[in-house]
């Protein structure tokens, strides 16, 4: 139930905030699911829907802010859908589920005097930094630097100007000419 409510909340928010843009509407459904997934097993269905809507608004606004401010193009919106909505979902989960046990079983004596680790905003923020920064951004940046050093990160400038499919189109035109001249 929560999965479908977060999907519908994401679709609804994406449709409204993007001005009926189909790309953002469909992407926002996934962003809503990702945003609400941090606490979907503990949320009420209406909470899942509202949290998904908030996450979609954050992802949409952050996408265009980063694009304008830093001139970074996220052509398919993958960073917005997975990254911004995911971080927003983790932080929202920390506030909405503050004090809930993080697991259903005892893990020993914790620093707060209980035998389980409670969910809290700071812990969720630190988890977001570890997941997205340490396990995502830093390895991605290192791989991009290695690929750039090898000359494999971007296509050549002349191909970029002509268009990536130019060579394929020219090859297919030559093949068509060869076939048509052979049949005459």
Can you name each region flagged by the protein language model?
Residues 1-184:
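Glycine- and aromatic-enriched membrane alpha-helices
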């Amino acid at each position: 139930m929560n999965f479908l409510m977060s999907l519908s909340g994401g679709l609804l928010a994406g449709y409204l905030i993007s001005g009926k843009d189909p790309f953002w509407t469909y992407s926002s459904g996934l962003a809503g699911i990702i945003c609400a997934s941090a606490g979907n097993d503990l949320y009420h269905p209406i909470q899942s829907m509202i949290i998904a809507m908030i996450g979609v608004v954050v992802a949409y606004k952050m996408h265009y802010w980063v694009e304008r401010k830093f001139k970074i193009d996220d052509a398919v919106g993958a960073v917005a859908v997975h990254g911004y909505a995911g971080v927003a979902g983790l932080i929202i989960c920390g506030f909405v589920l503050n004090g809930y046990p993080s697991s259903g079983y005892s893990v020993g004596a914790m620093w707060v005097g209980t035998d389980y680790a409670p969910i809290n905003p700071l812990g969720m923020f630190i988890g977001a930094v570890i997941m997205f920064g340490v396990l995502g951004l830093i390895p991605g940046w290192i791989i991009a630097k290695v690929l750039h050093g090898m000359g494999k990160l971007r296509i050549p400038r002349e191909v970029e100007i002509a268009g990536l499919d130019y060579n394929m189109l020219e090859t297919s035109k030559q093949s068509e000419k060869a076939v048509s001249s052979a049949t005459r």
